[in-house]
Amino acid sequence: MSTRHDEFDDFLRVLDEAGCLSHVLIVGSWAEYLYEAAGAIAGYQCAIRTLDADVLVRNRRRPADALSMPEVAKRHGFLVVRDRITDTTKLVHPMGLEVEFLLGKVGAGLEPSMGTNLGVTAQTLRHLDILSHNPMGVRYQGMDVLVPIPEAYVAQKMVVNHERGAKSDKDAAAIANLWPHIDLDAFEVVRSSLTRRETARLDDYMRCHDSELAT
């Protein structure tokens, strides 16, 4: 897995060189890795089992002067791929790490993907505002990287777990692994910011997984 970590580090350097670090959050399993590697959560140990990295674009219209992340990625040896069906951009490291870009749906949210001022087209999904509204910075490999606060990370995974299909068990394991390290007051603040439907889904998850969340 150390090789995969090196590939992830290469991608972060692309973000840094392209001026994009402050405009994105690392989400998904690699956020868990950063919680541990950057020492953001004392005593926490993650388990990375994915070849993919998910990157949440905070605001598709920022910065005002558009950047070109794909051009920088190409210079670092990444393959830039455009999905013919979804029209989304994917970066592929020569050693296999795949990077996908996400964007929160707003309003009716009819578009499956949207362009961004970072030079990539991102897949649009609901409930990502739970993450984007709760960022925290970590210092890693000399770079300032944004991730969601762990409480928001866990809350969002609870809200969407029923939609995750085959990945729901893996996500439940990640939640259980993080839960002992969660600040319950901060978690309640995040919970109080959710919509009524999101709160119902979170509460339902907690009832169904009560034994896993016992502290």
Language-model features: locations:
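Compositionally biased terminal segments of proteins
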Residues: 1-215
